[in-house]
Amino acid sequence: MEALRQKVKEDGVVIGEKILKVDGFLNHQIDAQLMYDIGETFYEQFKDQKVTKILTVEASGIAPAIMVAYKFGVPCLFAKKAKPNTLNKGFYQTDIHSFTKDKTNSVIISEEFLDEHDRVLIIDDFLANGDASLGLNRLVHQAGAETVGVGIVVEKSFQQGRTRLEEAGLKVSSLCEVASLSGNKVTLVGEE
Protein backbone atom coordinates (compact mmCIF):
# COMPACT_ATOMS: atom_id res chain seq x y z
CA MET A 1 0.00 0.00 0.00
CA GLU A 2 1.90 2.97 -1.28
CA ALA A 3 -0.20 5.60 0.55
CA LEU A 4 0.50 3.89 3.87
CA ARG A 5 4.21 3.52 3.10
CA GLN A 6 4.37 7.25 2.33
CA LYS A 7 2.57 8.17 5.57
CA VAL A 8 4.94 6.01 7.61
CA LYS A 9 7.98 7.58 5.91
CA GLU A 10 6.74 11.18 6.09
CA ASP A 11 4.77 11.27 9.35
CA GLY A 12 6.30 8.47 11.41
CA VAL A 13 8.45 9.63 14.33
CA VAL A 14 11.32 7.39 15.39
CA ILE A 15 11.80 7.00 19.14
CA GLY A 16 14.96 5.03 19.79
CA GLU A 17 15.72 2.09 17.53
CA LYS A 18 12.59 0.04 18.20
CA ILE A 19 9.62 2.42 18.54
CA LEU A 20 7.83 4.18 15.68
CA LYS A 21 5.21 6.78 16.61
CA VAL A 22 2.38 7.14 14.09
CA ASP A 23 0.00 9.27 16.13
CA GLY A 24 -0.70 11.62 13.20
CA PHE A 25 -2.70 9.07 11.19
CA LEU A 26 -3.21 5.84 13.15
CA ASN A 27 -2.69 5.83 16.92
CA HIS A 28 -4.15 9.16 18.05
CA GLN A 29 -5.49 11.10 15.09
CA ILE A 30 -6.97 8.81 12.45
CA ASP A 31 -6.79 9.26 8.68
CA ALA A 32 -10.24 7.93 7.74
CA GLN A 33 -9.51 7.60 4.01
CA LEU A 34 -6.34 5.65 4.74
CA MET A 35 -8.29 3.36 7.11
CA TYR A 36 -10.89 2.78 4.39
CA ASP A 37 -8.13 1.87 1.92
CA ILE A 38 -6.60 -0.47 4.51
CA GLY A 39 -9.99 -2.15 4.89
CA GLU A 40 -10.25 -2.67 1.13
CA THR A 41 -6.73 -4.06 0.89
CA PHE A 42 -7.20 -6.62 3.68
CA TYR A 43 -10.57 -7.58 2.20
CA GLU A 44 -8.92 -8.34 -1.14
CA GLN A 45 -6.23 -10.41 0.57
CA PHE A 46 -8.58 -12.50 2.75
CA LYS A 47 -11.92 -12.49 0.86
CA ASP A 48 -11.73 -16.22 0.10
CA GLN A 49 -11.39 -17.18 3.78
CA LYS A 50 -15.12 -17.07 4.67
CA VAL A 51 -14.43 -14.60 7.50
CA THR A 52 -17.28 -14.26 10.03
CA LYS A 53 -15.62 -11.92 12.52
CA ILE A 54 -12.82 -9.35 12.71
CA LEU A 55 -10.90 -9.33 16.00
CA THR A 56 -8.52 -6.75 17.45
CA VAL A 57 -7.44 -5.42 20.83
CA GLU A 58 -8.39 -2.00 22.14
CA ALA A 59 -7.56 0.70 21.31
CA SER A 60 -5.32 1.44 18.31
CA GLY A 61 -6.36 -1.62 16.33
CA ILE A 62 -10.02 -0.62 16.33
CA ALA A 63 -9.93 1.95 13.50
CA PRO A 64 -8.44 -0.34 10.84
CA ALA A 65 -10.40 -3.34 12.14
CA ILE A 66 -13.73 -1.53 11.76
CA MET A 67 -12.97 -0.72 8.14
CA VAL A 68 -12.00 -4.33 7.44
CA ALA A 69 -15.22 -5.52 9.10
CA TYR A 70 -17.21 -3.02 7.03
CA LYS A 71 -15.74 -4.39 3.79
CA PHE A 72 -16.47 -7.99 4.85
CA GLY A 73 -19.94 -7.11 6.14
CA VAL A 74 -19.21 -8.84 9.46
CA PRO A 75 -18.95 -7.65 13.09
CA CYS A 76 -15.78 -6.17 14.53
CA LEU A 77 -14.96 -7.50 17.98
CA PHE A 78 -12.27 -6.05 20.22
CA ALA A 79 -10.67 -7.54 23.28
CA LYS A 80 -11.15 -5.28 26.29
CA LYS A 81 -8.31 -4.49 28.67
CA ALA A 82 -10.63 -4.38 31.67
CA LYS A 83 -13.74 -6.34 32.60
CA PRO A 84 -16.70 -3.95 32.55
CA ASN A 85 -19.39 -4.20 35.22
CA THR A 86 -21.89 -4.93 32.44
CA LEU A 87 -20.20 -8.24 31.59
CA ASN A 88 -22.10 -10.66 33.80
CA LYS A 89 -21.87 -13.76 31.60
CA GLY A 90 -18.88 -15.92 30.71
CA PHE A 91 -15.81 -14.60 28.96
CA TYR A 92 -12.51 -15.69 27.45
CA GLN A 93 -9.38 -14.20 28.99
CA THR A 94 -5.63 -14.10 28.35
CA ASP A 95 -2.64 -11.89 29.11
CA ILE A 96 -1.06 -9.78 26.38
CA HIS A 97 2.20 -7.87 26.75
CA SER A 98 2.41 -4.51 24.94
CA PHE A 99 5.85 -3.90 23.45
CA THR A 100 5.30 -0.14 23.10
CA LYS A 101 3.94 0.38 26.60
CA ASP A 102 6.04 -2.39 28.19
CA LYS A 103 2.99 -3.48 30.15
CA THR A 104 1.01 -6.71 30.40
CA ASN A 105 -2.78 -6.48 30.27
CA SER A 106 -5.34 -9.15 30.95
CA VAL A 107 -7.76 -8.92 28.02
CA ILE A 108 -11.24 -10.38 27.70
CA ILE A 109 -13.93 -11.15 25.15
CA SER A 110 -17.49 -12.06 26.06
CA GLU A 111 -18.44 -15.65 25.21
CA GLU A 112 -21.60 -14.12 23.75
CA PHE A 113 -19.71 -12.76 20.73
CA LEU A 114 -17.27 -15.53 19.78
CA ASP A 115 -17.98 -19.24 19.35
CA GLU A 116 -16.87 -22.41 17.57
CA HIS A 117 -18.62 -21.42 14.34
CA ASP A 118 -16.51 -18.29 13.82
CA ARG A 119 -13.73 -17.86 11.26
CA VAL A 120 -11.70 -14.98 12.62
CA LEU A 121 -9.40 -12.50 10.92
CA ILE A 122 -7.16 -10.74 13.45
CA ILE A 123 -6.28 -7.13 12.61
CA ASP A 124 -3.70 -5.08 14.49
CA ASP A 125 -1.98 -1.74 14.02
CA PHE A 126 1.59 -2.94 14.71
CA LEU A 127 3.55 -6.15 14.73
CA ALA A 128 6.67 -6.11 16.92
CA ASN A 129 7.15 -9.30 18.94
CA GLY A 130 3.74 -10.75 18.06
CA ASP A 131 2.36 -10.85 21.60
CA ALA A 132 -0.93 -9.10 20.78
CA SER A 133 -1.80 -11.32 17.82
CA LEU A 134 -0.74 -14.48 19.65
CA GLY A 135 -2.89 -13.45 22.62
CA LEU A 136 -5.89 -12.81 20.37
CA ASN A 137 -5.30 -16.19 18.74
CA ARG A 138 -5.43 -17.79 22.21
CA LEU A 139 -8.85 -16.18 22.76
CA VAL A 140 -10.03 -17.56 19.41
CA HIS A 141 -8.88 -21.04 20.44
CA GLN A 142 -10.59 -20.75 23.84
CA ALA A 143 -13.83 -20.19 21.93
CA GLY A 144 -13.21 -23.20 19.70
CA ALA A 145 -13.15 -20.86 16.69
CA GLU A 146 -10.56 -20.69 13.90
CA THR A 147 -8.09 -17.92 13.07
CA VAL A 148 -7.91 -17.63 9.27
CA GLY A 149 -5.20 -14.98 9.20
CA VAL A 150 -3.55 -11.97 10.77
CA GLY A 151 -3.57 -8.57 9.05
CA ILE A 152 -0.98 -6.08 10.25
CA VAL A 153 -0.94 -2.41 9.28
CA VAL A 154 2.74 -1.75 10.13
CA GLU A 155 5.25 -4.55 10.76
CA LYS A 156 8.63 -3.94 12.33
CA SER A 157 10.28 -6.75 10.38
CA PHE A 158 13.53 -6.41 12.33
CA GLN A 159 11.73 -7.87 15.35
CA GLN A 160 10.59 -11.46 15.85
CA GLY A 161 6.81 -11.05 15.52
CA ARG A 162 6.27 -12.55 12.07
CA THR A 163 8.45 -15.55 12.87
CA ARG A 164 6.53 -16.24 16.07
CA LEU A 165 3.14 -15.95 14.31
CA GLU A 166 4.19 -18.19 11.43
CA GLU A 167 5.63 -20.74 13.88
CA ALA A 168 2.15 -20.78 15.47
CA GLY A 169 0.73 -21.68 12.05
CA LEU A 170 -0.79 -18.27 11.33
CA LYS A 171 -0.96 -16.68 7.88
CA VAL A 172 0.41 -13.12 8.20
CA SER A 173 -0.12 -10.19 5.85
CA SER A 174 1.53 -6.82 6.51
CA LEU A 175 0.73 -3.69 4.53
CA CYS A 176 3.92 -1.80 5.42
CA GLU A 177 7.14 -3.47 6.55
CA VAL A 178 9.74 -1.41 8.39
CA ALA A 179 13.25 -2.80 7.95
CA SER A 180 15.01 -0.47 10.39
CA LEU A 181 14.65 2.56 12.64
CA SER A 182 18.42 3.04 12.95
CA GLY A 183 19.91 6.51 12.75
CA ASN A 184 16.58 8.08 13.72
CA LYS A 185 15.28 7.21 10.24
CA VAL A 186 12.49 4.97 8.93
CA THR A 187 13.82 2.49 6.38
CA LEU A 188 11.19 0.31 4.74
CA VAL A 189 11.73 -3.21 3.42
CA GLY A 190 13.07 -2.84 -0.12
CA GLU A 191 14.93 0.38 0.67
CA GLU A 192 17.85 -1.19 2.55
UniProtKB/Swiss-Prot annotation:
A GO molecular function annotation here is: xanthine phosphoribosyltransferase activity
Domain of life of the organism encoding this protein:
Bacteria
Answer whether the UniProt record assigns the keyword Metal-binding to this protein: no
Which CDD domains does the UniProt record give? PRTases_typeI
Gene Ontology cellular-component annotations: cytoplasm
- Enzyme class per UniProt: transferase
| Name by which UniProt lists this protein | Xanthine phosphoribosyltransferase
Q: What is its EC number?
A: 2.4.2.22
Q: Where does xanthine bind?
A: 20, 27, 156
- Identify the metabolic or biological route this protein is part of: Purine metabolism; XMP biosynthesis via salvage pathway; XMP from xanthine: step 1/1
Q: Name one GO biological process term.
A: XMP salvage
